[in-house]
């Protein structure tokens, strides 16, 4: 039998590590433990700058169960719920009801804390096994995220209906990924308005003034920030893609 050790920070795998490698990994484990213990001291402290400005410290999560960590680490809410994991962890497109229950669970668990739900962000390095995407030379800047949703309006509407319905149970916001033009943003907002009208006709409760924001992760969007600011309620800087 082989003995395997893993460095979770670098992704390195050691098969039958030497005594020296075991010592090094043990020291790394202890160092990480100490760093975590050091951070624990700040859990219940107020988050503000030296000159007194309040700063919201929000978590990024990928599944509803992560809300337990949000609460235990005293975060002030969720700045990014990666809804694509609901799709990636499913054998088929999640239904409106399945999504609604997931978003509702997060909203209720966090009560009135802010929760920002990013709409489906696939493409690039994130694929769905049940949805075929075109092969591209540079998929990170190609057919992905909001572009896929605007081409598949029924898919987009299903998710928006679920988010809006769940917004009746907490402080939810909608965030649109990889928006590259004002036209894309306006088209998405029009679809959201259409869904609102449908829900009103069906007498289904939702937060009528739900905030809509965008991810700024394309250089052209960053350059046009002032124009985009007139069309949406907030930005989230997507440094991974932007840089």
Regions picked out by a protein language model, each given a short descriptive name:
Residues 35-243:
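Conserved alpha/beta-domain cores
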Residues 1-8:
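Conformationally flexible catalytic loops at phosphate/diphosphate-handling active centers
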Residues 1, 15-17, 88-92:
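Short, charged, surface-exposed secondary-structure boundary motifs
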Residues 10, 17, 26:
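Beta-strand/loop-dominated core regions that host nucleotide or nucleotide-derived cofactor-binding catalytic loops
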